[in-house]
């Protein structure tokens, strides 16, 4: 059983482990990084009729209500205290049996639900892959938008990057989120027949902080056991690779302000462990490109990811 850590302790560890993510998010509040409107605009919580509660309970100590906003042509959730999983299922005639849990990013303070969640899931479903967007629990933030921006500035102030070249273990700070991911894998396996999913072909792809959760689930998720993983503009810090580590797909832009100049220790770790790894370093794309239409080759990550999981035999039809 994964143990929930206290919110105060979780915040303290996150300040250290996620400093680059937090800094970039805070900077994005002042500097437009995309052509879309960078202003945060509060919106009503969208209807999510297909969302399934994961049963991991409310986040301990969290009292702020869940709130959503628009920014950069996408929608974002904050103060998520109850984790959910939303299925995006392919036409049964096209179903391959493969499934992917999609973990949006946002520095563990927000979730980019559209650009790094729903849009990814819809594209996967169109390829015959059952996709499931996980809305995992987040670090509490002030409901008020101005107070939220101020809290982020305080959050990353003075935080340092981890030493380069040394294995990083941020999993201790992510116990609630790892529990959410484990519950997502368990739910899909329980309902595999209903959803036309092969229980042995369930993978996970994550973006930025969601990539961090994907890696943490791979390393510390115990019974989660993803069949394959995608790390999309996530940290490439070296890790201790399990002997049974799944095939790894990585996509990153060389001009990513967070991780573009931090080395490729994760790739080296996987190769040293003699586990399958594929790495796409795009010349341009920045951070957070997701499914946004851009003039850079980084938009090709999705097609490459689908070809890669097909190469690994994940898209063979069940029948």
Residue ranges of each PLM-predicted region?
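N-terminal signal peptide c-region/cleavage motif recognized by signal peptidases
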Residues: 30-31
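Primarily recognizes the serine-hydrolase "nucleophile elbow" in alpha/beta-hydrolase
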Residues: 175-245
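C-terminal catalytic histidine-bearing segment of alpha/beta-hydrolase fold enzymes
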Residues: 276-319
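Serine-hydrolase catalytic machinery in alpha/beta-hydrolase-like enzymes
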Residues: 51, 58-84, 91-100, 105-195, ...
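Acidic catalytic loop of the alpha/beta-hydrolase fold
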Residues: 255-260
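Short beta-strand/loop motif that positions the catalytic acidic residue
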Residues: 250-252
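Alpha/beta-hydrolase
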Residues: 103, 232, 282-285
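Bacterial N-terminal signal peptides that target proteins for export
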Residues: 7-21
